[in-house]
A protein has these predicted regions:
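Hydrophobic alpha-helical segments
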Residues: 1-133
Length: 133
């Protein structure tokens, strides 16, 4: 979820399709992947961990920081090391996405283009309320 939100946030078309496939294979529901792709609010149902990761990643990509409440939720669930690793993952995929965008690297052959706004800078993912999580 974090990778999808990050590369979607940077509108990196070439980097969305492969992680989307991997996320589906890892068990992320297709409706969540599609919501992230289209910019709709994902319905996480009872998957509070995924909702927190979504919110953390969306805030970090859009604002360069997160609200204390979501940071605290991530630390409570994953620990300080987990929060650092999640931040590093988002930072790494931000760098990859920016590199693909600035050098106009196309989607790999055989992989369909999936983003409607590709390479157009930051895309604002809607927030999801995780206060109930």
């Amino acid at each position: 979820v974090a990778v999808l939100v990050t590369v979607r946030g940077w509108s990196a078309d070439g980097e969305f399709a492969l992680p989307a496939r991997d996320a589906a294979e890892a068990g992320v529901a297709p409706h969540i992947i599609e919501a992230i792709r289209t910019g709709a609010v994902p319905e996480f149902a009872d998957d509070h961990a995924a909702a927190e990761i979504y919110r953390f990643a969306a805030q970090l990509v859009q604002k360069g920081d997160t609200d204390q409440s979501i940071y605290s939720a991530i630390v409570a669930r994953w620990g300080e090391v987990g929060a650092v690793e999640l931040t590093a993952l988002i930072g790494y995929y931000s760098m990859v996405a920016m590199t693909l965008n600035v050098h106009q690297i196309p989607v790999p052959p055989g992989i369909p283009s999936t983003l409607e706004t590709k390479g157009n800078g930051l895309f604002e993912s809607p927030t999801v309320d995780t206060k109930e999580c």
